[in-house]
Amino acid sequence: MVKAIDKYWLFGVRAHQDDTLLDALGRGGGKRRCGSRITPAEGAFMLGVPNMIMVTGDNAEPVPFTHDAYQYCESFRPLKRVMWSSCGSSGWRNGNEEAFICDISHKYDNICGAYLDDFFTRFGSKPQEHTDELLACIQDIRAKLSAAARPMPVYVTAYMHGMKDIAKSVMDLVDGLVFWTWQSKELPLLPERFQQAEEACPKHKKLLGIYMYDFTTREAVDMELMKFQCEYGLELLKAGRVEGLVFEANSVMGIGLPTEEYLREWIAQTRDVEVP
């Protein structure tokens, strides 16, 4: 029997990565929100989720093959499944990510895939104008991942508002999509947009990303919208339309967001729901 908790993931980044974006608490003279020191492993422990997508920052940290990177892997030993980023925040790449993923796949049995964050805009804000570069990059990534201990499927961040700008030839080279609604005010459009994504990408594996914090407004996601996206995600999961839910992120945890408190309780309440 498969339970919902088996398909819950944390979107992990280094502690303090988003501190400069956590500055909106009490606008208009109120106190500043302090940064988050919560690590990815701590975030997974706090939420009680067993799977991790570890994404490097736009400064490349944790840098592949460093002590920091290996220590993150050590902290993930209790987790069931871990994807590591081939492409980090803002589309950052060092170029040795695939070699590192192959290396850790031989050392840690839970390494299960490569993740491309912000990949579609890494060559510019209009991905439809950079199809050749995107194709060449993905082909290179996939070729290098062939040295891994087992097949490493490639998943990519897909923002709901930008799906129409991605060439089909590019989409066809990735195995899975993690769908995100960047501006929380657009969450009411999620059912319609997700159906369109299903029709456009019927063969891809799909996960739904869920934000606790809106980086465009510098505020916690509205509670009603938070409840909506969680419940809709569970509905998709029970229907077999997605294979997982991804919660973003440890870097906004431990600072008192009401959405984090809600999410912890919601995960505890739904963890034993049977899913396909």
Name the predicted role of every residue range:
Residues 1-276:
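Glycan-processing catalytic domains of CAZymes
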